[in-house]
Amino acid sequence: MSDFKKLNVWQEAHELTLSLYPATSTFPQSELYGLTAQMRRCCVSIGSNIAEGYGRARENEKARFLQITLGSLSELEYQVLVARDLGYLFSKDHEDLTNRILEIGRMLGSLVNKVRAASA
């Protein structure tokens, strides 16, 4: 089994998760089981899918899980936007989270291409 924790993209995803939790802790109580929980689950799934993909034996399986991760990343990007527009996120938190999401997206895109090339 590959050590996913050595991947820079997983490390960035993990840091994103750690920064998202305090950013969402100030959301209204009414969102605890709504947007707060949804954003947290989505963010955790990003690192989880990278880890699961790297636990797979075949490169095409890794690529599939990385594609799923890209979808979760887009979902989180939208949720961060909604949270900002509802006034739940401070401008600095929105900017920080969005920049991290975009960087992880670039890293994932490169990794998907690399994994696909290895499986061809």
Describe the role of every protein-language-model region.
Residues 1-120:
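Short, C-terminally biased terminal segments at protein or domain edges
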